[in-house]
Amino acid sequence: MSDLLSGIKVVELASWTYVPSAGAMLADWGADVIKVEDTKGGDPARYLVSGGLRPEDSRVNANAVMEIGNHGKRSLAINIKSPEGREIFGKLIGQADVFLTNWLPAQLERADLTVDALRKFNQDIIIARGSGQGQRGPDANRPGFDGTSYTGRAGVAFALTPDGVEFPFAQTTAFGDLQGGSTLAGGVAAALFHRERHRHAPIVDGSLLAQGLWSVAPDIAIADYYGNDGVPKWQAGDAPNPVVNRYKT
């Protein structure tokens, strides 16, 4: 499946792991992904130390989380706020099939990278946006991470924390980011198919909050249907159905 998107060009303007991981998946499927970074240090994920594990102490002298979200890409540092940088960026967009970003609506507005502005460079480009809380509502311009928007606000921590425990469930690194990135990459693939069939380039929006809500959809539905707090949290060995009990092996 490594050549499914051969010939597709993606311009990514995104940082950390959520949206970049979507770009990595598109690269895995054969797309040519160009990651645009600023000229003052690039993606801050380059400097992330997870669990106190420094990249220079690893066997390969590399940042594991940065590699997960950015493997298979080409990288280019551009100051898109300068006239020269904007010209270069515009040429990249003009040649691309997909623009992938995690910039918030207000950031895109200030940078003159709104949908209308991007479509002046390329009217057929698919625009894919990933955010913390989505593109609408009072929190659209508030930043979000998977630990807050996905695990906390969406209720994932509540669903996974046993009753009577003092502290909520703690996710591992990029737990919600990678799920959200997979969904966003799938949305881009569907948009490419739609454009091929209907000659229309759609906008793809995803958020960590929406991804988290989908992850706990059974709890939400059961809470609505039965007026409770969601799927019962049985202790090990107590579930009424032995098939779903947990057993020590």
Give residue ranges: language-model regions.
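Acidic, glycine-rich segments within the central catalytic cores of soluble metabolic enzymes
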Residues: G41, L53-D57, R136, T148-T249
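Hydrophobic/aromatic beta-strand patches that form the interior of the parallel beta-sheet core
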Residues: I34-V36, L76-I78, I126-A128, V204
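Conserved small-residue-rich beta-alpha loop and adjacent elements
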Residues: S2-G42
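N-terminal Rossmann-like NAD(P) cofactor-binding subdomain of oxidoreductases
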Residues: S82, T101-L160
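Glycine-rich phosphate-binding loop and adjoining beta1-alpha1-beta2 segment
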Residues: A31-S75
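A structured beta-alpha segment of the ubiquitous adenosine-cofactor-binding alpha/beta core
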Residues: V11, D57-K120
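Structural scaffold positions in well-ordered secondary structure
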Residues: V10, L26, K73, L100, ...
